[in-house]
Amino acid sequence: ELSEENPAQTNDTTIGETALYIYTSGTTGLPKAAILSNRRYLIAADMSSKAGLNCNANDRIYLCLPLYHATGLLLGAGAAFASGASMFVRRKFSASNFLREVREYNCTHMIYIGELCRYLTNIPAQADDASNPLHSIMGNGMRPDIWMDFKNRYGINRVCEFYGASEGNVSFANLMNKDMTVGMTSAEVAVVEYDVDNDEIVRDQNGRCQLVAEGEPGLLLGKITPDTVFEGYTDSEATEKKVIRDAFADGDAWFNTGDLMRTVDVGFNLGY
């Protein structure tokens, strides 16, 4: 039986306090403990449930990703907690059992990573693969070369691909359901020239970063502001290494995502 009152400690908890630590994947160095605040958790859970998956208490989320990583924990379990949806939680992904479980447990939504979708695309096709309750999925790393095949084969209506890092201050989400994109962001970002061979940002004669031409690949930076806070790592030295200072003006600060991106024309622009 639940108490009608919040626990006493909630009076002393703020949105900026640390909720948990999540270790980064280690793609740009050794894994580091990233700090996730209550703010980050609540924003991610709310965004996933309402704007990404668009799920409610009548839905069920198929979740086979580890809960010690942000995708499974924040976008999967977080969406269920925020919306009231139920979850089918599998300890380990199984391509051979996937469709049977989706049908048996009436899963309407799924959280994915790209490799999971590739495995499901590569297994032998069956005539009734699209005959299942799954209609909306959210995750990251869906490759363009399998995107449409996977979507059509399994009868998926909505693929909400997202981009973000456990420690990052900006994220993108394909909220408008535009195929083969990571969508959009409301945060202030910059795509700047980057020398891949020398692994360094290209700066002009004044020491400033240079924006790439429209559609050209470049390094993604996210401006650090009161609204887009870089919460960093438990290691302050590692935190500082990810900050690009004086990029476009004296005193500015930007989070270095370490990822190359390019813009694509989807037929419209959104203003904020």
Tell where the protein language model's regions lie, with residue ranges.
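Conserved pre-ATP/AMP-binding loop-to-beta segment of ANL
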Residues: 5-23, 30, 53-60
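Structural detector for helix-capping/boundary residues
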Residues: 16, 38-39, 59, 65, ...
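Conserved S/T- and glycine-rich ATP-binding loop of Class I adenylate-forming
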Residues: 18, 24-27, 61, 67, ...
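Conserved AMP-binding A3 loop
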Residues: 19-43
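Short beta-strand->loop structural element characteristic of the AMP-binding/adenylate-forming
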Residues: 32-35, 63-64, 85-92, 160
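Conserved AMP-binding/adenylation subdomain of ANL enzymes
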Residues: 42-60, 68-108, 123
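Gly/Ser/Thr-rich phosphate-binding loop
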Residues: 82, 99, 104-113, 121-196, ...
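Conserved ATP-binding/catalytic segment of the ANL
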Residues: 208-272
